[in-house]
Amino acid sequence: MRRKLLLSPLSGLLMVGSLLVAQPTAYAETPPAYEPTTESLNSHPVPRWFDNDKFGIFIHWGAYSVPAWGPRGSYAEWYWNYMNSPGSPTNAHHKATYGQDAGYDDFLRQWKADKFDPDDWVKLFKDAGAKYFVLTSKHHEGMALWDSKVSGRDTVDLGPGRDLAKELFAAARKGEDKLKAGFYYSLYEWYNPSYTGRQPTNPYTGAQVPYAGAPVVGDYVKDYMLPQMRELIDGYDPDIIWCDGQWEKPASYWKTAGVIADYYNKALRNGKEVAVANRCKIETGNLDSPELDFQTPEYAVKPDIDPIKWESSRGIAHSYGYNQNEPEEDHLTSDQLVDSLVDIVSKNGNLLLDIGPKADGTIPELQRQRLLDMGAWLKVNGEAIYGTTYWNRAEEKGGPDDVRYTVKDGTLYATALKWPGEQLTLGADLPVDHSTRITMLGSGAPLTWSRDEQGRVVVNTPPETGRHAYVFKIETPGVRELLRTTSSLAKEVAPGGTVSGELTVTNPGTRQAPATALTLTAPQGWTATLGASRVRPLGPGESVRVPITVTAPADVTPDPYTLGLGMRTGRMTTTTALPLRVNLPNLSLGRPATQKSTGYDAPASRAVDGNTDGNWGAGTTTHTAEPERQAWWQVDLGASAPLDGVDVWNRLDCCADRLKDFWVMASEQPFTDDDLDRARTAPGVTAVHVEDQAGSPGTVKFPAGTTGRYVRIQLASPSNPLSLAEVQVRGRQ
């Protein structure tokens, strides 16, 4: 089920003539109580505040903050898990630093949090421009940061001797400028005997070790996990519940639906809007699953707009928990963090940026400074972030400037991620006319602009002011709302083929929008039709759907093409580009595939199964062993064919940055050499180098005239594993 915003009054779509019209639901109606069923829980609306606030702080703080160590590029909060892996860097580090008799639970007692100042934390979050935070109430180590009556494995009975969650929530809810406060909660615990059925052991001696503070219960979920979740909900009234560890078991094991229904109903009775992350798992719990209120990609950003609400989480460096082994160069710069926030918001996402406090409760100075830099930028430019929504498209593709768009009622914001110089070039489809006023936030003076020979809007910029990213505010007198158009039309069509879909026209603002006339233009020789030529006036949040059908000529050249959707609303006329690519057949679908090695039971065949889902939890991505030298994946097309190129779908979760600096090769003969240099320079091999991180998809073109039966993708990295969501080899059969 598609997630909907509480702002939206839509309850259904009815056919009126050839036009589908959204029927509004009165705000005053009291929604029914939620039932512990998938259908009922998935009908819960995304809170308005969550969609408006855009920026939150994630906090990973636990006993793992005592050793505060992990290999570069790893998660320090997974210290205990890595420590129990013989031969791992963490296993070796622990033995060398603490000795083989030192157990992980020693850190629980050593954790004092003696410098923890919740008021200071909250002030920092506010100064950073964040509107909410999510505290790790319990990570996979099992240490609860609240006074749990279910388990003595908490920060009141062990370590700090304080209810850390209570103190932070109280600080956040002081005064008028309150922060929304949420809990992360790990459903499973690595070594809880009540979950695993066995006592944890010393990884060096094999001797059993205690699991401090936790009771032994008969049913981990019924007697331990669910009661703890209810403690958090009933005792702390969180605004967000954010689960993790859901991948371990199916939804039928976790049984979270009852707790979530009670949480929603409690909020309903109290007139409160709350949100639950999809990892709380009532269906698949995959990071991109539309279940519950929002998706949760990790160290990944959607490649384009996703109308289903999502929130990307990541650390300032790679680890969520504090990792003293991460040097400054492993941390994102303030410029990169601002750019990431802008990019995410333009695609209908929120950014949940993690900090890892030290064991004593202080926040590392480097992390503090990054947050303050973001806050300084948001103080000037926040109107382009808070309370905005996505536009027709997220960015300017193919233009000279790297720009992201957001919209609020009748105002369009164009944010340049880099200073554009004397002129900023924007698309020809912008909603502007002769009276449009363009200013730069932080400057305020009206800027002159014109259209170039291609119809693009060219803005003459003021002297550079500010830092990180530059927001240009575009307003037209009398235009109170800007409509948004999205299309379900397929992104590709075969020569001579026909594709159909729907065009959705939405008023995302807070005021009524006037009627709109529609036209559709297509390249010469194409056929394109709309199911209606007019959209009636739309109230706030209303949408209409218009059928659309497109047929490509049989002799069309495989290339990207563009349809033009013309819209006239009042005196404003705009043309929106609808991209459609003509592709040759996918020759690799279902063909035999191999890879250098296989890790995590993820075979090479997954990359030719027709499923482009890039999330690991979906079970459709490949994976080699880890680490692996110059990892490769290859496919046998069955026969030689003229090849146009290869579309590669990257991972969309934690590991997208691994697929870069790679080669795509084609050959008439099988590849027989594991060495990259020898493989790509072998006789008859055509090889194309890709330096940047692959997209989803990323298209790699072969030189004209390339033929081949075998196609290989190979990393240059001496250690990174290769993981692919899908590979489509395009050519003529």
What name fits each language-model region?
Residues E464, T551-T557:
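Short, surface-exposed loop/turn segments at beta-strand-coil junctions that are enriched for proline
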Residues L430, V471, T476, L584-L587, ...:
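Aromatic, loop-rich ligand-recognition surfaces of beta-strand-rich domains
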Residues T136, R451-E453, P462-E464, V493, ...:
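Short proline/glycine- and polar residue-rich coil/turn motifs
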Residues V505-G509:
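Asparagine-centered strand-capping/turn motif at beta-strand->loop junctions
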Residues D555-N583:
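Terminal connector regions
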Residues T510-T516, L659:
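Short acidic/proline- and small/hydrophobic-mixed sequence motifs that coincide with surface turns
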Residues M1-A28:
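Secretory targeting and sorting signals
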Residues E29-L483, D647, H689, A716:
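Mature catalytic domains of secreted/periplasmic carbohydrate-active enzymes
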